[in-house]
């Protein structure tokens, strides 16, 4: 079981490294992406500076200017996302084929024992293609997904491909609180 775990971690690291290499070739080294990233950084810093200077004001003209700056920033972010999505689609197709190949190698084998009893909707993933009723048995796909998520995120930080904190703060997320709330946490 330990050998399988180490092999899966190596596979996850190798596929994450290959994915980041392909992304670098297709996206990060292009002049268009570099221009978009520099523009995004510049607009983000400018917006943060304006927000700090203005603070909480009731002037509608200043608020409109800030809203326009935020819209420009969102448009640049959207352009960057569209540029990256094209290569991510190709990488996704390639890794889906690799995943099915690796999944067939480890089919029916317990690769690890989970130290917890997984909740219902995760059991389908953690116990996929395994024989038996012990839900603490871990399948290849579950361990691979966990390792890939962890390795890829850290690899992006190490290689410098992860967005800066200021840019990440500006990117819209359905779970992120609105900018006007919780400013005291920043």
From Swiss-Prot:
Natural source organism: Caenorhabditis elegans
Record protein name field: Calcium load-activated calcium channel homolog
Membrane-related topology note: Multi-pass membrane protein
Pfam families: EMC3_TMCO1 (PF01956)
GO CC term, one of those recorded: cytoplasm
Annotated TM spans: 7-27, 88-108
One Gene Ontology biological process: endoplasmic reticulum calcium ion homeostasis
Cell compartments where the protein resides: Endoplasmic reticulum membrane
Topological domain spans for side Cytoplasmic: 1-6, 109-134, 152-186
Function: Calcium-selective channel required to prevent calcium stores from overfilling.
Superkingdom of the organism of origin: Eukaryota
Regions that enter the bilayer but do not cross it: 135-151
């Amino acid at each position: 079981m330990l050998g399988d775990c180490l092999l899966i971690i190596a596979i996850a690291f190798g596929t994450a490294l290959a994915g980041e290499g392909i992304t670098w070739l297709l996206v990060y080294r292009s002049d268009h992406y570099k221009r978009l990233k520099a523009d995004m950084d510049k607009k983000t810093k400018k917006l943060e500076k304006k927000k700090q200077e203005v603070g909480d004001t009731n002037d509608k003209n200043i608020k409109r200017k800030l809203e326009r700056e935020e819209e420009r920033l969102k448009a640049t972010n959207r352009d960057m996302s569209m540029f990256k999505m094209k290569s991510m689609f190709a990488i996704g197709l390639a890794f889906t084929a690799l995943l099915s190949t690796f999944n067939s190698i480890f089919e029916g084998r317990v690769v690890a024992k989970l130290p917890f009893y997984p909740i219902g909707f995760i059991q389908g993933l953690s116990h996929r293609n395994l024989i038996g009723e012990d839900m603490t048995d871990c399948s290849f796909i579950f361990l691979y997904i966990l390792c890939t998520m962890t390795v890829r995120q850290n690899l992006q930080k190490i290689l410098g491909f992860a967005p800066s904190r200021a840019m990440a703060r500006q990117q819209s997320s359905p779970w992120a609180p609105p900018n006007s709330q919780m400013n005291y946490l920043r």
